[in-house]
Amino acid sequence: MNCFFVLALFSAGPLVFAQDQLALPSAANELRSDDQRKMQNEKVGLVIHGGAGTIERSKITPEREREYRAGLERALAAGYEILKRGESSLDATEAAVRVFEDDPHFNAGKGAVFTSVGTNEMDAAIMDGKTLNAGAVAALKHIKNPVSLARLVMERSGHVMMDGEGAEAFAKENGIELVDQKYFYTPERWDALQKIKAAEKNRTGGGGKGLAITDQDRHGTVGAVALDAHGDLAAATSTGGTTNKRPGRIGDSPVIGAGTYANNATCAVSATGDGEYFIRATVGHDVSALMEYCGMSLKEAAQSVLDKVARLGGTGGLIAIDREGNIALPFNTSGMYRGYVDPNGKLVVEIYK
């Protein structure tokens, strides 16, 4: 049966098929004991990203490139150390993303971009591929590490997504660190906002100097996906959103199935790029669905979904890992800050195409 026909039927509503019509594996075949899972998944895997966009070697100084690479290496090392100890993929992805959130070079946490009114609002999500449990937070103004609050929402709130004041009140109740808005101020992000404001003023005929605006001035995201020694997948994503966004705007990062998704049966995905397009394309879940229902490989599914984003008019990229440890890192921009652990345990970081 054509896989796209199956997907169309599946999305139309609950239908019942004979087992041989779809050739889906039985639940008994999918379930394994912990010992069996450990034997089958001796290796671990980790992939990270620090955002995709207009990243050109000619526009980045050697010093700045070293700083980006060092930040990628720190995030990768933090997550990999956890996996090497036999701990969970959830712990590894959270740890890697926290490193990004503490680094002013990346658009998450400390390095979050500014809204149109000069404030910082952050989104994050985390998902457990073993249980399909997920936690997401949005429009945060005072949370130092949004990814940790997202995990707390998943594990203690009884909800999947919380935002704004309610999410921050929940954080206070549970000992999550809050900071003043001035903590998130960085000259580079403030200057990016001023460049965009000046360009807008120039376009509307109000004078002002026309300045070159790049994707890096506008947006960015960080994320991690991991496979642990128990065969469990996880994904985590965090972002400051888009420079000059309206207060209250929420992108794809905290939308489960769009910017963040994990399912042990298929893969874990974290996306970066034009959030509105990634939401409309349900990027994370679509990669999983193409693998589950169409039998595509991880790389085929990831590229197919990114091609769909491009057809809609969006740019960006994604990172993904499947239950066998295969990885995919496609992007349709000039660069994406990224890293992964190779089969020999070597940490690899890359920036350009």
Language-model features, listed with the residues they occupy:
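N-terminal low-complexity/intrinsically disordered extensions
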Residues: 1, 19-20
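Bacterial N-terminal signal peptides
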Residues: 2-14
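Alpha/propeptide regions of enzymes that mature by internal proteolysis
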Residues: 20-353
